[in-house]
């Protein structure tokens, strides 16, 4: 089955035939977590770096934010028997909202990526691969069976 992950959303699957997909990642991040031993995959589409900006919104939807969304995602994997050493984490998105990145006043895409790296560092985890920054949107597809992450951006397709 194909599951579409919306903005500020999370999907996790252990069904080998499933695909997880999210569209139109601009400054948002599409973060995939894959347990290669248990064959489980998760895809988080988050918008903003830090849930301390609005704790009420984060309580209502933790997937809005990198930190609170990652906490829910990782907690689910660990609760279901994953070990941190078995997790493969990749990310795409984090684009600038301006062609000239220096004109992007808020730099949300960059801040999202920094927030993710800080969160992972604090959890003792590392990114395996990333495709972030630049200008333009990305679509991310995650195959549960293989753990492959495909990124479509501006007409090209690549695997992370």
Where are these regions (language model features)?
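General beta-strand structural signal in soluble alpha/beta enzymes
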Residues: 5-6, 21, 43, 127-131, ...
């Amino acid at each position: 089955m194909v599951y579409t992950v919306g903005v500020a959303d999370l999907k996790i699957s252990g069904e080998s035939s499933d695909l997880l997909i999210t569209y139109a990642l601009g400054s948002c991040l599409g973060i995939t977590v894959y347990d290669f031993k248990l064959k489980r995959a998760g895809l988080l589409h988050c918008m903003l770096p830090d849930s301390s900006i609005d704790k009420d919104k984060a309580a209502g939807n933790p997937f809005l934010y990198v930190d609170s969304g990652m906490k829910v995602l990782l907690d689910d994997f660990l609760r279901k028997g994953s070990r941190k050493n078995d997790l493969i984490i990749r990310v795409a998105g984090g684009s600038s909202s301006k062609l000239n990145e220096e004109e992007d006043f808020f730099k949300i895409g960059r801040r999202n990526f920094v927030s993710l790296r800080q969160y992972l560092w604090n959890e003792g985890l590392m990114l395996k691969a990333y495709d972030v920054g630049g200008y333009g949107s990305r679509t991310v597809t995650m195959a549960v069976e293989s753990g492959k992450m495909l990124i479509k951006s501006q007409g090209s397709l690549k695997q992370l």
